[in-house]
């Protein structure tokens, strides 16, 4: 090699960039547990106060603010799914591909809990982690939603696709994004 010093410098730059990206990905992934907990506690509290109908109202009115509150340091936090209830949460092309990959892997027997995907897409660091359908979710998202609740869901979400799930199935994913270079180093 004619330019060993240049090669070494380039290698260090690439290594530093990879470490910086890994740090950003870890930073984003670290936001998910608190967001998940806050969302779950809000929905469970609404269920205790007024049953599934109150939980549907809480999801519709409070969930967007909870997502916004958990976005920090340039991160935007949200949820998406292949079968959405709220059309505002529909996946973009990359999210759809990741969700389909999560679904294939789960179908092949890989546990959802161990999955995560992170990439740089169009100048943004993107992170997704799957959401498994939990037992409490089945009242509104399961295979046997009570008729009165189903009517309420149709009133609030005329294009609802988010039913028919079984416990443990892929319900959707947490999705996070932030600019790769936002001027913070």
Q: Which ranges hold each PLM region?
A:
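Bacterial N-terminal signal peptides
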Residues: 4-13
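The canonical Cys-X-X-Cys-His
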Residues: 134-144
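Sec/Tat signal peptide C-region and signal peptidase I cleavage site
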Residues: 14-18
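Extracytoplasmic c-type cytochrome modules immediately beyond a signal peptide or single-pass transmembrane anchor
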Residues: 19-133, 148-185
């Amino acid at each position: 090699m004619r330019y060993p010093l240049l090669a070494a410098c380039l290698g260090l730059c690439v290594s530093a960039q990879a470490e910086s990206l890994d740090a950003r990905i870890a930073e984003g992934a670290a936001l998910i547990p608190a967001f998940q907990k806050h969302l779950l506690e809000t929905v469970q509290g609404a269920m205790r106060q007024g049953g599934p109908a109150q939980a549907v109202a809480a999801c519709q009115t409070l969930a967007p603010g909870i997502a916004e509150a958990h976005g920090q340091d340039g991160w935007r936090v949200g949820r998406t799914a292949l079968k959405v209830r709220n059309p505002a949460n529909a996946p973009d092309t990359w999210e759809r591909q990741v969700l389909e990959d999560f679904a294939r892997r789960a179908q092949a027997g890989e546990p959802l809990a161990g999955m995560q995907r992170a990439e740089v897409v169009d100048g943004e660091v993107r992170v997704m982690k799957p959401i498994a359908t939990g037992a409490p979710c089945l009242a509104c998202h399961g295979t046997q939603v009570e008729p009165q609740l189903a009517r309420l869901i149709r009133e609030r979400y005329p294009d609802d696709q988010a039913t028919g799930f079984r416990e443990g199935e892929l319900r959707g994913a947490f999705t996070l994004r932030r600019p790769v270079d936002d001027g913070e180093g």
